[in-house]
Amino acid sequence: MTARPPESCVLAKDRPEEPVVPVVSPGPLVPVADFGPLDRLRGWIVTGLITLLATVTRFLNLGSLTDAGTPIFDEKHYAPQAWQVLNNHGVEDNPGYGLVVHPPVGKQLIAIGEAIFGYNGFGWRFTGALLGVVLVALVVRIVRRISRSTLVGAIAGVLLICDGVSFVTARTALLDGFLTFFVVAAFGALIVDRDQVRERMHIALLAGRSAATVWGPRVGVRWWRFGAGVLLGLACATKWSGVYFVLFFGAMALAFDVAARRQYQVQRPWLGTVRRDVLPSGYALGLIPFAVYLATYAPWFASETAIDRHAVGQAVGRNSVVPLPDAVRSLWHYTAKAFHFHAGLTNSAGNYHPWESKPWTWPMSLRPVLYAIDQQDVAGCGAQSCVKAEMLVGTPAMWWLAVPVLAYAGWRMFVRRDWRYAVVLVGYCAGWLPWFADIDRQMYFFYAATMAPFLVMGISLVLGDILYHPGQGSERRTLGLIVVCCYVALVVTNFAWLYPVLTGLPISQQTWNLEIWLPSWR
């Protein structure tokens, strides 16, 4: 949407008998100054209320399901490793496995909770639950900024609170919750950077500096993009799948720059992006994440007894043009061992798990993961036979809409050129599509934890379109509000129904059977 700046009027007469007609001199079109929502106080109040609700749901009975005091599912790896980090000067000795297969940040964060509350269920889950609460606040702020609506942002927060995947992930000491937090935070930083760059370009256009060169103006230091690089580095230092988001978000950031220069009348927007933005973007979203990743290994570098600390790689750096220090070569060797472990974790090599799944089942949560189940001597359900189980499963009222929501988002992106849906698709696909590159690999549905916030964002944008359809009358507006309220109520009800199997509450065998909606959930 554009508007013409006021210009001086000239008077013209084509014929002596015609009246004088004012003619406006053509001037450059100035994009509307829209750089984010304006209801700041109300926005923060709503964010605070939603965050308070998220705090209750994430921390209520957080340490209850611990399988007689021991970690559940893959907590059995990360809770002890975090305890080692806490008591071994920041590094793992890992005597049970002899191999560390993930970078250190997630375990360092788990160790914070264990340091405060001890080696128990609440302790090793505390930091993940805390960041799960902050994740809800981030999604509220991100969707509010993308949609320019505090109401739509609030809806997104409620939906994320009621998402089974995000809920269980925040309440278990697995690495995927930390990965999700960092990538969503980086995504939010890039969205703010997008608006900030447009604001600076707007000022430059009004000042007449946009046409000074064919490349357009410089936009100064972009601290939000720098912060995104730091967060992406922490994501990679949690799980290597953070690299996928570095690539997808890097491309998204450059697309933002090209679009901004085109929108603000730069003569050569592509050339301007190459000239002005590619190198700074590569520094912020390439070099900075790598530097942060290395920095997280500081305790490993400082240790004399860490795994492979002095096991220099066989061929790494020996004949290289730039000789590498032995410590770096040892880290390469250490990393290569972890990589070979993951590369060999395939079905063809005989690695199977009863709850593994493939990525084509993830969008609709067709094959969840059973984290824990106890059917022996369970009491407290009021029936003769009780079950206590915790399952990672997406709330069907949202996840079963994934395919139509993705299709609609694709239509909005390619046909309507709607950047809001485009960025949501970028985030969703970064957490999903790369896993198709190696279908033989053993995979689990909890890898889809990073997809959940972007699914919620997409659904929220659709609900926002229903609420704020251009040109709608009062009846149409009322109908849209009713539809949105009914849908949100359906999601909340669905979440409440699944709550026992998301938290491990005792339920009867009959109720357990009713909770299992699909054969593939067994």
Curated annotation (Swiss-Prot):
E.C. code: 2.4.1.-
Transmembrane stretches, start-end: 43-63, 120-140, 150-170, 172-192, 240-260, 282-302, 391-411, 419-439, 443-463, 479-499
Biotechnology: The BCG strain overexpressing this gene (rBCG-Rv1002c) has the potential to be an excellent candidate for a preventive vaccine against tuberculosis. Two compounds containing pyrrole analogous rings were identified as significant inhibitors of MtPMT activity, affecting neither the growth of the mycobacterium nor its secretion of mannoproteins. These molecular cores could therefore serve as scaffold for the design of new pharmaceutical agents that could improve treatment of mycobacterial diseases.
Any one GO biological process: protein O-linked mannosylation
A GO term from the CC aspect: plasma membrane
Membrane protein topology class: Multi-pass membrane protein
Keyword Glycoprotein part of the UniProt annotation: no
Disruption phenotype: Deletion of the gene leads to the loss of protein O-mannosylation. The mutant has severely impacted growth in vitro and in macrophages, associated with a strong attenuation of its pathogenicity in immunocompromised mice.
A Pfam family it matches: PMT_4TMC
Record annotation: effect of changing D74A: Loss of protein mannosyltransferase activity
Domain of life per record: Bacteria
Residue ranges that the UniProt entry lists as topological domain Cytoplasmic: 1-42, 141-149, 193-239, 303-390, 440-442, 500-522
EC primary class: transferase
Role this protein plays: Protein O-mannosyltransferase that catalyzes the transfer of a single mannose residue from a polyprenol phospho-mannosyl lipidic donor to the hydroxyl group of selected serine and threonine residues in acceptor proteins. Sec-translocation of the acceptor proteins is required for protein mannosylation, suggesting that O-mannosylation should affect only extracytoplasmic proteins. Is crucial for virulence. It may play a role in adaptive regulation of the mannoproteome during host cell infection. Overexpression in M.smegmatis decreases the cell envelope permeability and promotes microbial biofilm formation. It also inhibits the release of pro-inflammatory cytokines in serum and significantly promotes M.smegmatis survival in the lungs, spleens, livers and kidneys of infected mice. Overexpression in M.bovis strain BCG, the only effective tuberculosis vaccine in common use, leads to a strain that secretes more glycosylated proteins, significantly enhancing macrophage activation and immune protection against M.tuberculosis.
Protein name: Polyprenol-phosphate-mannose--protein mannosyltransferase
Gene source species: Mycobacterium tuberculosis (strain ATCC 25618 / H37Rv)
